[in-house]
Amino acid sequence: MKFDPEKIKRDAKENFDLTWNEGKKLVRTPTLNERYPRTILKYGKAHPVYDTIQKLREAYLRMGFEEMMNPLIVDDKEVHKQFGSEALAVLDRCFYLAGLPRPNVGISDERTAEVKEILGDIGNDGVEKIRQVLHSYKKGKIEGDDLVPEISTVLGVSDALVADMIDKVFPEFKELVPQASTKTLRSHMTSGWFISLGALLERQEPPFHFFSVDRCFRREQQEDASRLMTYYSASCVIMDEGVTVDHGKAVSEGLLSQFGFEKFLFRPDEKRSKYYIPDTQTEVFAFHPKLVGSNSKYSDGWIEIATFGIYSPTALAQYDIPCPVMNLGLGVERLAMILHDAPDIRSLTYPQIPQYTEWEMSDGELAKQVFVDKVPETSEGLAIAASIVSQCELHGEEPSPCEFPSWEGEICGRKVKVSVIEPEENTKLCGPAAFNEVVAYQGDIMGIPNTKKWQKAFENHSARAGIRFIEAFAAQAAREIEEAALSGATEHIVRIRIAKVPSEVNLRIGSIAQRYVTGKKKKIDMRGPVFTSVKAEFV
């Protein structure tokens, strides 16, 4: 709360200790539903794949490479130029781009009548305008998503009517079948490097050191724990007259060492792709301590992480490139799986999709899903709730029957006297579960006493909901007293006995937590004998 510094200085000069102690009155008391852990400061989190991409970009830049964006859409003739006799095998793994053809639509007398029936009397001039727009669409002068707005504009009718007219009068648009083009989505970054380097030589001279971290597409038979149909490749090239295989080894070590890899092993790749010079295509195996003992086939710490080679002159010559080029590439997702301890590439990439990811909520997240249902809406109501809790804390062990005044004043325009009571004999003001606190522990949400038995559960403050049964009940009692004051009642009594479910102690569990707890076969346990009552007497 805001305060007057000058007043504080004056008061402190007169009585420092009193002013210091009263400082706590200037700090607003949060409502039950505002208490930590429900009051949080959220922060953004990078996706693990994009986080790894950024780290790779920074690593390449530190090594002196310049970033380049390569063509993503590649004509299949480029693949033939680059891969030679292997082109068909490569293209079998490529996605071809297809598009809908643009039909040649005629407007007969019958269709003219249908158009006028839907759009109204637009006259022969209106029909001619439609014919001209459709002709322009066929010629490619108007894009498909502009067709309806264009007709709407020239005729001065609504988009909805035009869309309805096209749907009913011109069925050709609904019968269109996509036609494949010769354009493909690149399956290797190599497809783009040849095009980029060939074009660059017209304006610059080597040596070149470039890198690109971007998306590739591969038509896999199916996606599984280790492969996706779309992935990110972190690729680099060095174009220099003196480039050798050793440059590939040096780049491998320089790049991967920045990610915690410690030892390297280079083996000839058995694939022998035709776009590499024979015997230069090399697999890079690297040792990472995080893999040691992992529940994977890489538990010895070694993993195949990258491939490099020297581009073949037979492929480079197709682009008039006269200089040797070393190319290295690695899959970003595989590196991200290591850095983020992910066992499945699908769950790493798409954690939001249930079929790929085991749902896990921490105890702290579950605790944030616990709320008090009915809460007072006035400052007087909040004061009543606080006074009820205070009296229960002071006199909870008092034998019954007993009654303790807790608050007196005006609420909602009426004077009221509030007391905590227990009319029954041979018991206490509060039952043994009154001061149970709501805690999330090992996936369960429970109302438990803060005793030695539950010490482990209470050690994690972020998993404590910050709500005791008596506080939730007091909030309900205060809210009902507000409502009773407005209704004109002369007396109102609120009782709680043995709680069996959250609602009986005025608690509400968020639907997400309920689904999680049920799905995990965990429990929500808010049972216990609370046994107390609150009486409000209106004057």
Curated annotation (Swiss-Prot):
Kindly name one Pfam family recorded for this protein: tRNA-synt_2d
Q: Where are the transmembrane segments?
A: none
A molecular function GO annotation:
phosphoserine-tRNA(Cys) ligase activity
InterPro entries registered for this protein in UniProt: aa-tRNA-synth_II, aa-tRNA-synth_II/BPL/LPL, O-Pseryl-tRNA(Cys)_ligase, Phenylalanyl-tRNA_Synthase, SepRS_C
Q: Which EC numbers does the record give?
A: 6.1.1.27
Positions with a binding annotation for substrate: H188, M189, T190, S233, A234, S235, Y275, Y276, N327
Q: Which UniProt keywords apply?
A: Aminoacyl-tRNA synthetase, ATP-binding, Ligase, Nucleotide-binding, Protein biosynthesis
Task: Please cite one Gene Ontology biological process associated with this protein.
Answer: translation
According to the UniProt record, what class of enzyme is this? ligase
Reaction equations catalysed? tRNA(Cys) + O-phospho-L-serine + ATP = O-phospho-L-seryl-tRNA(Cys) + AMP + diphosphate
Entry function: Catalyzes the attachment of O-phosphoserine (Sep) to tRNA(Cys).
Q: Which family does it belong to?
A: Belongs to the class-II aminoacyl-tRNA synthetase family. O-phosphoseryl-tRNA(Cys) synthetase subfamily.
Q: Per its UniProt record, what NCBIfam families does this chain match?
A: sepS (TIGR00470)
Mind telling me which HAMAP family this protein's record contains?
Sep_tRNA_synth (MF_01674)
Task: State the protein's name.
Answer: O-phosphoserine--tRNA(Cys) ligase
Q: Which species is this UniProt entry from?
A: Methanosarcina barkeri (strain Fusaro / DSM 804)
